[in-house]
Amino acid sequence: MEKKVALIIGAGDSLGSSIARVFAKDGFTIVAARRNGSELDKLKKEIVSQNGKCHSYSLDARKEEDVTKFIEKIEKDIGQISVAVYNIGANIKYNIIETTSQKYYKVWEMAAFGAFLMGREVAKHMVPRKEGTIIFTGATASVRGKEGFAAFSGAKHAKRALAQSMARELGPKGIHVAHVVI
């Protein structure tokens, strides 16, 4: 079992991969996930070529059963998750009048609901250990809306509120929760 495991959900081509590289350089075993896990091959090869450890997976973070099983698998097969990062954004511009409820819900589901699922599931493991870090990446949309981004801003505000609530609840239990606007 690995000593330090960093989970990055939303390990995309930009920020998520950069986060994975930083934790890998600090000696963490990386567990990188995104909807299409095969797109993580380049990141995995890069981390391994620098003597790091990286596991890559496909995961739809909006599906509760999948997230629950995924977190259990990591804890059982790879090691205790020390740090969990939720980096899924869904930054899509939709005019409010033309935004269907389906589009709004999908953006919220990716940015906010998936964050809740990951946060809850990793907290179930971290709380008994009385240690761990949960990081939610945000955007300026987390603190103010912008024309054409009602769905994105609403979801980002929700993720920020989730992080604040989790920090107050889990902080006294040894879990650090942060919402980082990038």
Each language-model region and where it sits:
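Active-site loop of short-chain dehydrogenase/reductase
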Residues: 3-4, 80-81, 126-139, 172-175
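Conserved glycine-rich cofactor-binding loop
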Residues: 12-13
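Conserved glycine-rich Rossmann-like NAD(P)H-binding loop of the short-chain dehydrogenase/reductase
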Residues: 28-42
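Rossmann-fold cofactor-recognition segment
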Residues: 47-65
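Substrate-binding pocket helix/loop in short-chain dehydrogenase/reductase
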Residues: 95-96, 103-108
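A short, exposed helix-loop element centered on a Lys and neighboring polar residues
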Residues: 119-120, 164
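Catalytic loop of short-chain dehydrogenase/reductase
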Residues: 133-158, 164, 168-171
